[in-house]
Regions:
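A charged, well-structured terminal subsegment
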Residues: 28-29, 35, 394-397
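Intrinsically disordered or compositionally simple regulatory linkers and C-terminal tails
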Residues: 34-53
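Flavin-dependent oxidoreductase catalytic cores
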Residues: 50-415
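A residue-level signal for beta-strand positions that form part of recognition/binding surfaces
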Residues: 11, 28-31, 62, 73
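Short glycine/proline-enriched turn or capping motifs at secondary-structure junctions
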Residues: 22-29, 399-401
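Active-site donor-binding loop signature of nucleotide-sugar glycosyltransferases
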Residues: 19-22, 34-36
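A short beta-strand->alpha-helix segment at the C-terminal rim
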Residues: 1-21, 27
Length: 415
């Protein structure tokens, strides 16, 4: 436990952590939507923020999952870098992940790493589908472990019907026919009018991919990763099985939520069987599809219960990106209520993600038990040393910078 006392002068800021001071928020409640196309606001959004006395900075308290102990509650979200060559990561990934680890983040999660070549979003996506990928990832992992006390996870996934596209800064649209590859999905439904129609998966496809996930887990262990996250959100392959908008199967893999969860659970069990018992597994889900007829938060609670019963250690609670319809414009912390409800009702630890801002927000999320960990993506793109800067801002005592950067702890920025 860090020997830091939360300053009394911060108390009022702490109590009112949830609403960002931007328009769209009201005192003690959350107003999420602008425009008219969004579905109705789930009833649990309208609730008073609980108040609780604080004496310490919750952001800088440790947290354990199985044999992995994190020094604080900050996680770097997996973010596709589109910088690999034939699936092999390189110096960019060493710097990208290594700098955030050196910057004080407790857990850095590598981008969605595809378990088969047809599962790539683009030609430049990272992979763990052939033996030569493992040593390249090991170089990244070794750097993080050698030069920081951070832990490093890998997000394993398959893009499904959202595969075979240009990289983000080239428009992210479907590749032309002479560069494209076949895509697969639970049902033959294209992601957008311009997208390739995926082939509906057979049982043989499922068995092949279950083994691909298992092999990727074995290589991830050889590379030294501390955690695996399964990408089960955002409209990629596993997410497409879960959502009723994208799974129209009439066999045992479609229909009821129990059936739609069959393939995700088969993947999880295969990974768990090939991953050390003392190392945790996470899964990212889209808890709310932002579309009529899609996944609702009640479903997310049930998913949390199923995954907890199967042995999942923590649920990374995101939302949306399942369909081509744009997500409604939202304010900060718009997904935290999903995490809070799943955590409370499913009884499983959660990570929250989505427009998480300053350290006061993170302190509030942890103290109010809305999530156990806070994922930050764009914020850590902007500031790789967010954790160090937060510790300085909060006045955390005995905070340790990397030895090479120790003098920075004495720097006092001028506003």
């Amino acid at each position: 436990m860090l020997g830091h006392m939360w300053r009394a002068a911060k108390a009022s800021k702490f109590v009112t952590w949830a609403p960002c001071p931007s328009k769209g928020w009201t005192s003690g409640a959350i107003s999420l939507f602008s425009g008219t196309r969004a579905p109705p606001v789930p009833s649990f959004f309208h609730q008073t923020i609980r108040k609780r006395p604080m004496t310490e900075a919750p952001m800088f308290t440790p947290f354990s999952l199985r044999g992995m102990t994190l020094k604080n509650r900050l996680v770097m979200s997996p973010m596709c870098q589109y910088s690999a060559e034939d699936g092999t990561v390189n110096d960019w990934h060493v710097v990208h992940l290594g700098s955030r680890a050196m910057g004080g983040t407790a857990l850095v999660i590598a981008e969605m790493t595809d378990v088969s070549p047809e599962g790539r979003i683009s030609h430049k996506c990272a992979g763990m589908y052939k033996p030569e990928h493992m040593p390249a990832w090991k170089r990244v992992v070794d750097f993080v472990h050698t030069h920081s006390d951070a832990k490093i996870g890998i997000q394993l996934g398959h893009a499904g019907r959202k595969a075979s596209c240009h990289v983000q800064w080239e428009g992210a649209g479907p590749l032309p026919a002479d560069q494209a590859w076949e895509t697969i999905a639970p049902s033959a439904l294209p992601f957008s009018p311009d997208s390739q129609t995926p082939r509906e998966m057979t049982r043989a496809d499922m068995e092949r991919l279950i083994e691909a996930y298992a092999q990727a887990a074995r290589w991830s262990e050889q590379a030294g990763f501390d955690m695996i996250e399964i990408h089960g959100g955002h409209g990629y392959l596993i997410s497409s099985f879960i959502s009723p908008l994208t799974n129209k199967r009439t066999d045992e893999y479609g229909g009821s939520l129990e059936n739609r969860m069959r393939f995700p659970l088969e993947v999880f069990h295969a990974i768990r069987a090939n991953w050390p018992e003392d190392k945790p597994i996470s899964m990212r889900i889209s808890a709310f599809d932002w579309a009529e007829g899609g996944t609702e938060v009640d479903d997310a609670v049930e998913i949390g219960k199923m995954m907890k019963a199967a042995g999942l250690d923590i649920l990374d609670v995101s939302s949306g990106n399942v369909t081509n319809d744009p997500r409604p414009r939202v304010e900060g912390l718009f997904q935290t209520p999903f995490s809070e409800r799943v955590r409370a009702e499913a009884g499983i630890p959660t990570m929250t993600v989505g427009n998480v801002g300053g350290p006061e927000q993170i302190n509030g999320i942890i103290a109010e038990e809305r999530a156990d960990l806070c994922c930050m993506a764009k914020g850590q793109m902007f500031d790789p040393y967010f954790a160090h800067h937060a510790a300085q801002k909060l006045g955390v005592e005995d905070y340790k910078w990397p030895n090479q950067y120790g003098a920075a702890g004495f720097f006092k920025p001028v506003d």
